[in-house]
Amino acid sequence: MPHHYILTLFGLLPVATNISTWWNFGSMLLTCLALQVLTGFFLAVHYTANINLAFSSIVHITRDVPYGWMMQNLHAIGASMFFICIYIHIARGLYYGSYLNKETWMSGITLLITLMATAFFGYVLPWGQMSFWAATVITNLLTAVPYLGTSLTTWLWGGFAINDPTLTRFFALHFILPFAIISLSSLHIILLHEEGSSNPLGTNPDIDKIPFHPYHTHKDLLLLTLMILLLLIIVSFSPDIFHDPDNFSKANPLVTPQHIKPELYFLFAYGILRSIPNKLGGALALVMSIMILFTIPFTHTAHLRPMTFRPLSQLMFWALISTFVTITWAATKPVEPPFIIISQVTSTLYFTFFLSIPILGWVENKMMNIS
């Protein structure tokens, strides 16, 4: 029997017997993070943060560095996998009421914001056409901030336009933020295991717990193996499936792409931003699309923790998932009818879900006669 604190923490950690496959995504995210840090380090060794050499250095990595193509594709596609796992992880938290463990939820959403910032800075680094214009459009939103906007943008750019200082500081931020992510992840795990994870029934599992190892480690390994297998299949056979064709051209400030869009995992937020025809309004909606997740623990009024036995909340939850997918799809299309109205309707529905949580909880309590 291990007596060391760390071994005890991970090996003998008591976990509910009835947690399902949806609880596997935490360990998958940890694997994704390790993969990103590892591949990112080897890419940083060969990368040059200069606007004249950045694009060429990526070409050099993929062509000349041994297994450079694999590192580059694992890093890029691994980021997409990372965010897919994150969104499923958050959806599970919403469905099963994991957000009632407030400290864990708050640290998790802070982690999400840090991850989004890191991924955005990373997307700019290849200095391709779409990287440059996505950076221009998104950083330009800072000018919408009253009084301070222009100063903030100039400070972030390191000049009056996106140039060499911008790329240098984005590379520095992309390199340093993963250390903040590792720290926040550790905090997230510590806070989670202080109270213990939730379970599909939303009941107190203290009377029925088993050690994390070997039971849940073996269960986690199945999805983990499938995820790595899928990642390697995509890297080997369709490495450009998530890439934008415009990004295979070097950044040209004089030529605007026909349709500017960020990476796959940011499309829902970009769709919400684009649906509002006002710069400040769009920027606020973009920020609120993530920040609204902080409010959920305080708007929960239902007496039952998970949505397992709450049909109205289930209906709204699956409507949210459909809305999320539809916004993502609409954001890939040009800004023209009918995609404008689709984005506006789905963006409204997205925020409606979060506003309806307290009302639905109250109605369900009345329906089930829970006082």
From Swiss-Prot:
InterPro entries in alphabetical order: Cyt_b/b6_C (IPR005798), Cyt_b/b6_C_sf (IPR036150), Cyt_b/b6_N (IPR005797), Cytb/b6-like_sf (IPR027387), Cytochrome_b (IPR030689), Cytochrome_b_C_euk/bac (IPR048260), Cytochrome_b_N_euk/bac (IPR048259), Di-haem_cyt_TM (IPR016174)
Gene3D superfamilies to which the protein is assigned, alphabetical: Cytochrome Bc1 Complex, Chain C
GO biological process: mitochondrial electron transport, ubiquinol to cytochrome c
Membrane spanning residue stretches: 25-45, 69-90, 105-125, 170-190, 218-238, 280-300, 312-332, 339-358
Main localization, broad class: mitochondrion
Binding site residues for a ubiquinone: H193
GO molecular function, one term: ubiquinol-cytochrome-c reductase activity
Membrane association type: Multi-pass membrane protein
One Pfam family this sequence matches: Cytochrom_B_C
Other known facts: Heme 1 (or BL or b562) is low-potential and absorbs at about 562 nm, and heme 2 (or BH or b566) is high-potential and absorbs at about 566 nm.
Entry similarity comment: Belongs to the cytochrome b family.
Physiological role: Component of the ubiquinol-cytochrome c reductase complex (complex III or cytochrome b-c1 complex) that is part of the mitochondrial respiratory chain. The b-c1 complex mediates electron transfer from ubiquinol to cytochrome c. Contributes to the generation of a proton gradient across the mitochondrial membrane that is then used for ATP synthesis.
Protein name per its UniProtKB record: Cytochrome b
Organism field: Antaresia childreni
